[in-house]
């Protein structure tokens, strides 16, 4: 009797949640959404638009989960197979074009789980010990996994494609070249890299520009991979590899680069991060940061919440905005902003390439110990981010700054890769 009542209650909640979602989707203004649920089809938005998306409900509990968990539950229920889409990127793009509606959905769907997610995110903050566990949770998943979908330079950051026809390999090599040229690296330079990855940039810079490189990571898996790579290349005399938190680094350097590491710093620690970058640079030194950014207009709202990526992909992660980084440079350092380059759409292309290669690898992943839930999680992660970059709710910038002192650089390099 109790089981029957529980089932009846769940069914009632599912129906109520379904009706609430359908009512909210009736306010869709941009693009067209087709929602399929069993034999029913519901169309929302504007017919004849350039953006069409489809959502197929596989389990009626989807609506209840969405009511209780909001956008995070949307990702969870994708992983669990409660819904699917023939093109999840298009669905993310459609929702990104309807941010007012999306905000309304988030306020009405998910308020019950918000306090739990916020507390959990706070517990993942990037203290010295927290940073190591957060980095390990993502980057120590196994080098074989990353080798399967990254390029030969093992670049887990956005490519900069030199042409519409360029491959992932072309784009990542162009990105490495662009970074080195914008820093105007030469044989007399000592470059500090905060966030080694698997060592690709350090090896590229030392090999092609003859500079000395000190590079640091707090991922044991990345450190061990980079150590072997540096030895194979015979670059041990040019590259110093550290397993150390950036906050503990000492000395001064001619040039400093940090590629998509700032997202792992955490909002509360950004002032310390910029002060440390400034301390580590010699007078006249140059800095290049490659960063995923959130739109300035949505930054405050973003800081108040927790999204799917922070919950399941990058624990402790937090995107900066361009204005925030410029403000921190001015308030916390003596550095001056020299140039800013936007490459957001290049990241959308990069993610599309990664996802294609990841899905091609997917049939082999269970043999390596990865579950179907993991595969679906990462598929959604790639689609979620790609859609955001295409619609510019997030973007990718390279920020160049300089310390006071003798410039030692031309300042008028041609800008490539836009």
Spans of features found by a protein language model:
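Conserved class I S-adenosyl-L-methionine
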Residues: 187-195
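Substrate-binding/catalytic lobe of Class I Rossmann-like enzymes that use SAM or dcSAM, i.e.
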Residues: 293-409, 415-418
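A short glycine-rich, Lys/Arg-flanked "PGG" loop and its adjoining helix->strand segment in the class I
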Residues: 271-283
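A short acidic, Gly/Pro-enriched loop at the edge of an enzyme's catalytic core
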Residues: 247-257
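Feature captures hydrophobic
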Residues: 1-172, 178
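Conserved beta-strand signature within the Rossmann-like core of class I S-adenosyl-L-methionine
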Residues: 284-292
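Conserved SAM-binding motif I beta-strand of class I
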Residues: 212-217
